[in-house]
Amino acid sequence: MRVLLGFYRGSYHKFLISAFFYLIKHSPTLFSPLLIAGVINGVLEGGDAARHAILLNTGIWLGLLSIHLPANYLHSMYRSRVIRSTEAGLREAMVRKLQELSIPYHTQIQSGRLQSKIIRDVEAIETLSTQMFVNLLNIVMNLTIMITITAVKNRIILVFFVLVAPVASLTVVAFRRRISRVNRAFRLEMEETSARVMEMVEMIPVTRAHALEEVEKERMSRQLQETAEKGYRLDMVQSNFGAAGWVVFQCFQALCLGFSGFMAFRGLILVGDITFYQTSFTTVVNQFTALINLLPIMTKGLESVTSVGEVLSSDDVEENEGKTELAELRGAFSFRHLAYRYPGSEKRVLEDFCLDVRPGQTIAVVGESGAGKSTLMSLLVGFMMPESGQILIDGQDISTINLKTYRRFLSVVPQTPLLFTGSLRDNITYGMDHVSEEKLEEALEAANLKKLVDQLPQGADTLLEEHGANLSGGQRQRIAIARALIRDPKVILLDEATSALDVVSELEIQKALERLVKDRTTFIVAHRLSTIRNADWIVVMEKGKIAEAGTYEDLLARKGIFYHMESLQMSLR
């Protein structure tokens, strides 16, 4: 609850203003039992007193009703502005946090779960806030006014009102833990379902290609049935909880009616007061019933607060504050006895990796899958820190450098190109403002995209489908290459960037890269060994270690691992 209130810090005064207008808005309902009792007692008294009581109480009621609409408008305006702005602010805070969290954090949690937290859980928090502000405020206000008036009129009947509180508390205690447990199970199951649905959608081409539609339907059906079962358990617990509270409170109301009727029969209270006390007790019972019915919503909302808090409170963030900011980068790298193992694994994927790289050199890294090539690239970008050893950049340890300033000098082309829905121009100039047409043309030409752009209906402004689905694999890869090249980086990282290109495009890209890597430090991870003939230095990795290193010709002359890899590829061409 403290976390939830923290979300609204700075807006408490607006809530108080809204609460004030809420009180005015509901004043006709709050005072109606008293006004009705006044009319009944006046009529029973007869004469001028009856006329006066009818006119006075009716006039007061109509006067209170006349201010309902303006009070409702002001109450809703203040409440909605606070809740909606906080809802948007909470999602923005989660987006900012996700951008700060480390890459290992994102690899360990499914994107569907994060999507569920940002959309579904924040929506549940908004519902909780609305329910608490409207219903809880209404409950507190009604209870306070009814109990206060009853205490002034008759303290004996007040005993019935007061006894409702401990009975409600016992009912809540009896069900609270179970509701909380079932709510948590349902929330986790919904996150899993969200992740499975996203995974299913992304896998549709693979599923269709292997005629596995029925298998996937069955898999999703089991998941959805499990979610439905968890939801059923939650519904039953909530239903039983509400029914138990209702029965107990109705018993109390029947006793209150009998007791107030007995007191009127004995002449201790007026007949009209029976209506007042019964209406007041009905209001009190209804408020406690509403409070009990509100508990499942509050439990669900507070579980969502916990879920969102898991992200916002995570300390698995990339720390850059106070570290050295790079104003320039020459591109000299030194890897000193580098070692790394992934969390939860006993095996090192990199061990005793040593290499010195001069500015402007092109370094190629080759090896079988699992040799540690991609891990090395992730360490080089700063996605992870080495378990032991050092990476020196222009003589400075990477752990002491502000990585945001370092990455401004990098361009990375991943093995799988990542494109978003938008124009081709937007995808290439992602994150850059005011890119000239000349610079864009140069990047398109260098990445062998000029011919493609000329054929598109709107040229560079042609919209791409989701993930660039309306392009070939090679075209998507070339867009990723153009995105890297347009930044005019000091360091280029190519993670098997030409693996999706046809032979003709590969040759053209190779010529472009030879021009563009000049005076830039370049790291290339490659499977096609023919693409790294002109590399200044080739590192052959095996089981996380450097097995051999040298120029293309030197390695072939040694007839070692590299020679056998190249011979095998030559035989397959």
Label every model-predicted segment:
Residues 47-50, 149-163, 237-306, 311-312:
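Helix-loop-helix
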Residues 10, 14-24, 61-64, 134-185, ...:
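Transmembrane helices of ABC transporter permease
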Residues 98, 220, 308, 335-337:
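Conserved catalytic Walker-motif region of ABC-type ATPase nucleotide-binding domains
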Residues 15-71, 151-156, 267-271:
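Transmembrane helix-loop-helix hairpins at lipid-water interfaces of multipass membrane proteins
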Residues 1-12, 114:
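A short amphipathic helical element positioned immediately N-terminal to and/or at the very start
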Residues 327-573:
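ABC-type nucleotide-binding domain
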Residues 9, 103-104, 120-129, 133, ...:
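An intracellular "coupling" helix at the cytosolic face of ABC transporter transmembrane type-1 domains
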